[in-house]
């Protein structure tokens, strides 16, 4: 594993158990894994950027070789270079993810040919989980246990107790 440093990026709005599975698996493959939280300019955030970062940090706190980094704006390859990353880590749930990632990898490789991209297939029972589906469940106050880390559940319960709009 010597010298292999990974970067797994996303908006994590919110972080799901699917994301966590990818992060845990990557932590066994790399000496160090950075998890870069970004804002997606094509999506309006459900949770604030700060709250997403906080929940993600709480979710990965038991993984000693994982560090959450905030990169509100910019390109993943720029952050990867800044952190001396050797590999971008991407998760695939289905063929739609594959098509999207193939296009993204083309541009990442053009911008940073020295950084390799690796793909991890989602664990079968976690493939249906997506942040957008979780947001729908939260909006209707449906149970999310088993779909997201405890940090997300705690935050949603806190907001529901205060009757706040998320």
Curated annotation (Swiss-Prot):
One of its GO terms (biological process) is coenzyme A biosynthetic process. Substrate binds at residues 11, 43, 76, 90. Its EC number is 2.7.7.3. Keywords: ATP-binding, Coenzyme A biosynthesis, Cytoplasm, Magnesium, Nucleotide-binding, Nucleotidyltransferase, Transferase. InterPro entries: Cyt_trans-like, PPAT, Rossmann-like_a/b/a_fold. ATP binds at residues 11-12, 19, 91-93, 101, 126-132. GO terms for molecular function: ATP binding; pantetheine-phosphate adenylyltransferase activity. The keyword Ribosomal protein does not apply. Pathway: Cofactor biosynthesis; coenzyme A biosynthesis; CoA from (R)-pantothenate: step 4/5. The record marks 19 as: Transition state stabilizer. Homohexamer. Belongs to the bacterial CoaD family. This is Phosphopantetheine adenylyltransferase. It comes from Streptococcus equi subsp. zooepidemicus (strain H70). The gene is coaD.
């Amino acid at each position: 594993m010597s010298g292999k440093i990974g970067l797994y990026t996303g908006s994590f709005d919110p972080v799901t158990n699917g994301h966590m599975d990818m992060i845990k698996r990557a932590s066994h493959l790399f000496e160090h894994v950075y998890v870069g939280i970004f804002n997606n300019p094509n999506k309006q955030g459900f949770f604030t950027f700060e709250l997403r970062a906080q929940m993600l940090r709480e979710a990965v706190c038991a993984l000693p070789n994982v560090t959450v980094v905030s990169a509100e704006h910019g390109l993943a390859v720029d952050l990867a270079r800044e952190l001396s990353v050797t590999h971008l880590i991407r998760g695939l749930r289905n063929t739609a993810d594959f098509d999207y990632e193939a296009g993204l990898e083309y541009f990442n490789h053009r911008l940073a040919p020295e950084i390799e991209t690796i793909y991890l297939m989602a664990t079968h029972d976690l493939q249906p989980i997506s942040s957008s589906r979780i947001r729908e469940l939260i909006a209707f106050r449906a149970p999310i246990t088993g779909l997201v880390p405890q940090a997300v559940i705690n935050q949603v319960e806190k907001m529901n107790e205060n009757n706040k709009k998320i």
